[in-house]
Amino acid sequence: MSIEYYEVDDVDRVIKIVKEVLERFEFIEIAVLFGSILRRNFIRDIDVGLVVDREISFKEFNEVASTLEQTLNIPVDLVILNDAPPLIRFKALVEGIKIIVRDRKKLFYIISVSFMELKDMKEKLRILGIEETHT
């Protein structure tokens, strides 16, 4: 099995395309571009995080992912941040490029909740005597 890499030399173009595709889906409240595309030009996939206003079906998830992949011609790792672990959710929303934000208050609320969940986990690990790992 070989790993295929894709060159992305115009992140602004990717942002524009992702925004055009995702704006069609009304259930998407927040969309961010995060991960390796923010740090390098050669990538295996494009990480797109979504906050949705309701539970979405497998069919809807696949429709979003496949539309992005077909439009970009690059594999897309679509992450529903509502269900993601707190660290991934926090890093994506804080460090990622915001593409769609329909409700800024909700964005800040989710970031705050994620931060508090991380602090709670850190405290639980400290109480249990488990070393903290750095990511």
Label every PLM stretch briefly:
Residues 1-30, 38-42, 53-135:
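Catalytic core of pol beta-like nucleotidyltransferases
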Residues 44-46:
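Conserved loop-to-beta-strand segment in the C-terminal subdomain of adenylate-forming
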